[in-house]
Amino acid sequence: MFGLESKSPKILVIGDLMIDHYVWGSCERISPEAPVQVVDVKDENNRLGGACNVVHNLIALNAQVFVCGVVGNDEAGFWLGEKLESMGVDISYLFVDTSRPTTKKTRVIIANQQVLRVDRESKTPIDSHIHNNIVQHLHAVLDEVDCIIISDYGKGLLNDELTHFVIDYAKSKSKLVLCDPKGKDYSKYTGATLLTPNKKEAELATGITICDKDSLIKAGMTLKTQCQLDISLITLSEDGIGIFDNNQIHIIPTRAKEVYDVTGAGDTVIAALSFALSSGCDIFQACEFANVAAAVVVGKVGSAVATHSEILQYIHTQPSNLQQYIESKIISQESLFTLLKDLKQSKIVFTNGCFDILHIGHLSYLNKARDLGDILIVGLNDDDSIKRLKGKERPINTLHNRALMLAGLECVDYVVSFCQDTPLELIKAIKPDVLVKGGDYHNKEVVGKEYAKEVVLIDFIEGHSTSNIIESIQRSKICKHS
């Protein structure tokens, strides 16, 4: 469905690195020293937490990951660095701050119930020496990566100055910047590509109580305007992800079947979004991918990750609303032009036609066209333009039915109709990387070729055409009545 298994984008995660330390035990007595439980420890282990969990999710998706953060000069910091490096993470931008401990959260669990949490951390902002050292070294990796994730847990690393520097420099290089925000003042995230607040965080940041669709749209648009975001979205828990534009909301519904534990789901969402966007997906496809990844994760216990194989298996075993997905691929020209702003890193393939009676020749042609890039857009003649081109008896199938048939093909990403006799104006607006036409255009002028980077002609399968099918049906009728 997504075709991202072979992708391996370079992604930098800058944020608050943590260790989640779990202690499992039993309790059968009270301490004689004080009225408290005595825990007999049976097992304990360390897991990656905070921004490290984002890293873990990216590694599971086969991204090339760089991490920038601060650890203390302690055993926990050594373990964290060694663990990340063993996973293939580039830790060249991991800095040691002797004035602070490595953030470590210890959870004591008895009979599957958390009874105590102990935090070792410092929320003090990093000192100027560490700050300057980070800025000095970050230029090189910011130039190299496709995307930056800012994972802010409010532990002192991401002060206003450092956050502004990362966003401003990255945007000057046309890099994607995704932020998992913290607190109620989002001004330091101004200029980011997108933020991933949940509904409660969006309320806190905007001062808007979200109680219905209108207030949700107001909050989403407020975030977009105030933070000058390219894309505004709010994660909606069991309702999915809301994307906001032009005072409207588009909700990508959740894919979760069963929820066992929501721990780390937000980290999975931002990791999956960054992976998909960096790999050429548009925001709608990226949110769909993130929803599936999150559905896999919440079906597990504890902080977990989702691999490509798990995502594919989940899709194939879920009775999803296929009709809704198909219909979402049929879009207006206005919506398409908005989408194209988010597809700058994708190789766009465009073709067009009437596609009146879909047949094996069409399927072969469209599959070959899709293989030429990342996104295949099919321009579809409306009914009136077909009548002008083919005669008053055509089309056989209406525009709506033809569009649904095309959208039902896995190789087709978007279907957009046009009313003119040729798709010239549409091609001029899209400016595709690849313009595809049928092999019968060898001796014809390809309309709109001057607006495409490349023109590719694909031969049709001999003997397979809509005209042949119609003629065959007509001959059959004549024979039947003679």
From Swiss-Prot:
One of its GO terms (molecular function) is heptose 7-phosphate kinase activity. Keywords: ATP-binding, Carbohydrate metabolism, Kinase, Lipopolysaccharide biosynthesis, Multifunctional enzyme, Nucleotide-binding, Nucleotidyltransferase, Transferase. The active site is at D267. Residues 1-322 are annotated as: Ribokinase. The keyword Transferase applies. It catalyses: D-glycero-beta-D-manno-heptose 7-phosphate + ATP = D-glycero-beta-D-manno-heptose 1,7-bisphosphate + ADP + H(+); D-glycero-beta-D-manno-heptose 1-phosphate + ATP + H(+) = ADP-D-glycero-beta-D-manno-heptose + diphosphate. GO terms for cellular component: cytosol. ATP binds at N198, K199, K200, E201. Its EC number is 2.7.1.167, 2.7.7.70. HAMAP family: HldE. This is Bifunctional protein HldE. It comes from Helicobacter hepaticus (strain ATCC 51449 / 3B1).
